[in-house]
A protein has these predicted regions:
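Cysteine-centric segments in proteins
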Residues: 1-74
Length: 74
């Protein structure tokens, strides 16, 4: 499981997509509201693929935001 993920864009369904140190793609399936993020892997590691496996609720990666300068833990 990756400990750091980097924001890489938004998929065709409006989900934020991240890439881990291993190259694995993840998405946040919470696209609105004030709820905590819910991460899943991407099916076949495809940027626009469907969410696949749920990440454990206690998985708390360091997220590099879209400008690559700030690190935030969520």
């Amino acid at each position: 499981m990756d400990k750091t993920i980097k924001y890489v864009g938004i998929d065709i369904q409006g989900r934020r997509v991240y890439q881990g140190e291993s190259g694995r793609l993840y998405c946040n399936t919470v696209t609105f509201g004030n709820r905590p993020p819910h991460y899943c892997t991407k099916l076949n590691n495809d940027f626009d693929g469907e969410p696949d496996l749920d990440m454990p609720q206690n998985w708390n990666p360091t997220v590099m935001d879209d400008n690559d300068t700030d690190k935030n833990t969520i």
